[in-house]
């Protein structure tokens, strides 16, 4: 991995997001692709885990305030629609994040900088890094800038996504909650295939695949829902 001009990278991120990072090593971690990092180097995976939770929490609060008459189910479906991968990827592309992700030349040549899974992961990692670097004001400002208008225009309640529908189905019948497990990841890095297994106690398991872990979970949930609704 070649040396990175951290100050130049921080300036580009400031121009893209409006946030000035203080901890440049943290920013570097948020933008480092897992395939580029060495065993001793950090990459964006841990910050992605954190950023995913921060984004979900902030959008949840936003919707709670915007739609005081919506029940839990409506709010959940709206949140799911707002934080789904395609929305996150669209925002990542709008700020030119792909060109700022640190990856190998081969990865970039194969389209890695515009890979939906990479863009989604990197933007969530960047949000997680904002949280760690500057606290609530840092990430709230960015999330509100890019998600508030989208939320305000949700005058309807989106249809349930398969994971939410499956969860509500089993809860309504007193069944054990679905458990999701990543079984495998195959294919080239710029076009991966994830396989996720969903299981419900005493009702077996089903395997779903997709170009990201989240899409594979949704596919598995859809297939499981089809299976259990066809039970006698």
UniProtKB/Swiss-Prot annotation:
Q: Which reaction does it catalyse?
A: Endonucleolytic cleavage to 5'-phosphomonoester
Q: Which UniProt keywords apply?
A: Cytoplasm, Endonuclease, Hydrolase, Magnesium, Metal-binding, mRNA processing, Nuclease, RNA-binding, rRNA processing, rRNA-binding, tRNA processing
Q: Which InterPro entries match?
A: dsRBD_dom, RNase_III, RNase_III_dom, RNase_III_sf
Q: Does the keyword Aminoacyl-tRNA synthetase apply?
A: no
PROSITE patterns according to UniProt: DS_RBD, RNASE_3_1, RNASE_3_2
The record places domain DRBM at 161-230
Identify the catalytic residues: 52, 124
Q: Where does the RNase III domain lie? A: 10-135
Which residues hold Mg(2+)?
A: 48, 121, 124
Gene Ontology cellular-component annotations: cytoplasm
The UniProt GO MF terms for this protein read:
double-stranded RNA binding; metal ion binding; ribonuclease III activity; rRNA binding
| Quaternary structure annotation from Swiss-Prot or TrEMBL | Homodimer.
The name this protein carries in UniProt is Ribonuclease 3
């Amino acid at each position: 991995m070649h040396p990175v001009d951290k100050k130049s990278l921080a300036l580009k991120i400031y121009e893209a997001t409006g946030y000035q990072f203080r901890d440049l090593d943290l920013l570097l971690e948020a933008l480092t692709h897992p395939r580029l990092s060495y065993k001793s180097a950090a990459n964006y995976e841990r910050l992605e885990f954190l950023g995913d939770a921060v984004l979900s929490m902030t959008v949840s609060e936003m919707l709670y305030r915007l739609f005081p008459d919506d029940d839990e189910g409506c709010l959940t479906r709206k949140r799911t629609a707002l934080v789904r991968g395609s929305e996150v990827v669209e925002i990542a592309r709008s700020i030119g994040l792909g060109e700022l992700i640190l990856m190998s030349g081969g990865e970039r040549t194969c389209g890695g900088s515009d890979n939906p899974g990479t863009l989604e992961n990197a933007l969530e990692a960047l949000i997680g890094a904002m949280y760690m670097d500057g606290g609530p004001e840092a990430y709230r400002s960015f999330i509100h800038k890019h998600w508030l208008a989208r939320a305000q225009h949700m005058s309807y309640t989106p249809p349930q996504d398969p994971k939410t529908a499956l969860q509500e189905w089993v809860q309504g019948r007193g069944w054990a909650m679905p458990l999701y497990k990543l079984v495998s990841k195959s294919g080239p890095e710029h076009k991966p295939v994830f396989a996720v297994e969903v299981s419900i106690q005493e009702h077996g398991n089903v395997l779903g695949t997709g170009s990201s872990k989240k899409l594979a979970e949704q596919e598995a949930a859809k297939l499981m829902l089809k299976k259990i609704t066809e039970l006698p």
